[in-house]
Each structure stands twice: as C-alpha cells, then as structure tokens.
Amino acid sequence: MINRFSRTQRVIGRDALHKIQRAHVIVFGVGGVGGYAIEALARSGIGKIDIVDHDTVSLTNINRQLIATDATIDQYKVNVMKERIHTISPDTIVNALPIFYLPETKDQFDLSQYDYIIDAIDNVTAKIDLIVTAKSLGVPIISAMGCGNRFDPTKV
C-alpha cells in the first residue's frame, strides 16, 4: 500500500519507520536551524513532537526561516510551525509551546518523557542548561552549535 511514508519505509525498513512513528521528540528553537529539523522530522513520519519557542515571526526571518512569510509576521513561530506540520503530516501530534527555555523556566518541562531532545537554541545559558539537564536524565540530545547573532565567526 502506498502512503506518504512508503518511500521512507523502503529506505529504512518497516520496523525503523514504526519506531519513528512511535517516537516523541521535543525541539527547542523554531528558527533557522530548528525549523528545518522540525520539518525533517515531520516528513520522516515522527509520531509526536513538542516545539518550544517564545518568539514571533519577524520580517528579518524571511531570508532563512521556513515559516517566515509576509502572512506569518507577528505570529508565534510555534503556532505557524504547528499549522505547517499538519499540512505535511496530519497524523503527527504537535504541541506548540510559546515558552522561552531558561534555567528559570525549565521546571515547566518534564524532559524525561522524550525519546530525543533537539537543541536549536541561540541563548548560551539556556543551551548549556538544557544539555546538562538532558544528560542528567539520560535523554539523548542533539545540539546545534550555531552562532546565532554573531557576525564574525572567528570570534565564536
């Protein structure tokens, strides 16, 4: 039977696809890195994804972020991304959380419930705290080491 993930299944196999479809992932950051990661997960057939970002789409995001268009300016990035994911993979459960992850807000998250954590945060303090917390819980974390807001890469 052909379905939206039949080609993925041909590449990785039925068991691996079912594992992806049962997975629960959280992504922190819905910007230039996180947006692409979230969309790739949806196109791979992820079962459940929580997306976290307190920011809204701005005009300056249009050159590099999937969700940024004139029509989405001033909307929460997580809400725009949730709508986009539902057009790609309607069976994916998406929880949109417009929260700024910081050491002070981390108690709002039970990170132990996730199969994987993706860190696409551009705040160094938050990034370090998230990595340390994930490691202490034994939850695998994939961390993007971008240089958001840096203009001279030799100083990163």
Which role fits each region the language model picked out?
Residues 33-34:
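Hydrophobic/small residue at the entry helix of a nucleotide-binding pocket
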Residues 116-156:
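E1/E1-like adenylate-forming module used to activate ubiquitin-like modifiers
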Residues 104-113:
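Short amphipathic alpha-helix with an adjacent loop that forms part of the alpha/beta core around
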